[in-house]
């Protein structure tokens, strides 16, 4: 006979197994499209723009395989972005510790080369990329497959006759970012989008930047009911952990990312493609 005590005991024993099974085998394979519609005043005069953001791919077998990256790329294309931003961390640190096996960066880049957008695919590097062969693996592979890598660079783009600037920073974790120097490359008053890997840079972003886009945090990667985020790799705790963040007149979007680091688990933060819509016809989310 199953008594209440036995039921609670068995449920207590089963819960960690169910949690572990879901966090290891189910949530990492999910894929969401998360929509944001910020309305920064600094975008006044800018075009209506659909931005797809892919962050923290961390390519590694058997979880983030080239075939899975291809699936992500095809799903992104189906969302019809005007521009695709890759927010860093294509390499997977877990492979150094015998967890999974490395995916050659040439295969990751080949899978990402499926991405299509009228205004191009633009990437910054993350701390895992710099920490593994100083980023040269990613630079070479992305160049070979036509993916534009930006390191303290500025690019003037135009849609529907309306210009804007895209800035891409070097990795801040390794001190390779030059925000003042990159901002100085902006040559006119067209609105500015800043792409960086780590969101900690946001404390230094000036008011005239319309939107900052980052990854790095994985949204905490594990968010427990009743507990919240376990850990965010940031000097500012949970301040820039995830989502659309508005401070004063400044807007930041932090992607929860796609892959995993440390352990091959996700819980409460499913992998996501972020879609950001900017423009005069947008109904703001904040």
Predicted regions and their residues:
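Beta-strand-turn-beta hairpins that frame and shape the catalytic cleft
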Residues: 40-51, 155-166, 246-251
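Active-site neighborhood of phospho(di)ester-bond hydrolases with catalytic His/Asp-centered motifs
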Residues: 54-55, 84-89, 121-127, 150-152, ...
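N-terminal secretory signal peptides and thylakoid transit peptides that target proteins
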Residues: 1-19
């Amino acid at each position: 006979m199953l008594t209440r005590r036995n039921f609670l005991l068995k449920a207590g024993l089963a819960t960690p197994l169910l949690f572990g099974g879901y966090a290891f085998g189910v949530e990492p394979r999910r894929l969401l499209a998360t929509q944001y519609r910020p309305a920064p005043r600094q975008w006044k005069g800018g075009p209506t723009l659909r931005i797809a953001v892919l962050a923290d791919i961390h390519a590694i077998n058997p979880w983030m395989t080239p075939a899975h990256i291809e699936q992500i790329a095809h799903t992104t294309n189906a969302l019809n972005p005007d521009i695709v931003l890759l927010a860093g961390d294509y390499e997977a640190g877990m492979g150094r510790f015998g967890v999974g096996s490395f995916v050659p960066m040439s295969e990751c880049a080949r899978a990402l080369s499926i991405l299509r957008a009228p205004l191009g695919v633009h990437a910054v590097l993350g701390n895992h990329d710099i920490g593994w062969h100083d980023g040269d693996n990613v630079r070479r592979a992305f160049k070979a497959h036509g993916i534009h890598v930006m390191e303290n660079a500025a690019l003037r783009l135009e849609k529907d006759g309306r210009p804007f600037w895209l800035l891409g920073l070097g990795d801040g974790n390794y001190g390779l970012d030059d925000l003042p120097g990159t901002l100085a490359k902006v040559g006119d008053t067209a609105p500015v989008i800043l792409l960086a890997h780590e969101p900690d840079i946001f404390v230094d972003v000036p008011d005239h930047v319309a939107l900052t886009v980052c990854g790095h945090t994985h949204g905490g990667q594990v968010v427990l009911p009743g507990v919240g985020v376990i850990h965010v790799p940031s000097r500012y705790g949970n301040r820039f952990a995830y989502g659309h963040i508005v401070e004063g007149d400044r807007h930041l979007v932090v992607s929860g990312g796609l892959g995993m680091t440390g352990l091959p688990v996700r819980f409460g933060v499913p992998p996501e493609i972020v879609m950001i819509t900017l423009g005069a016809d947008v109904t703001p989310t904040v």
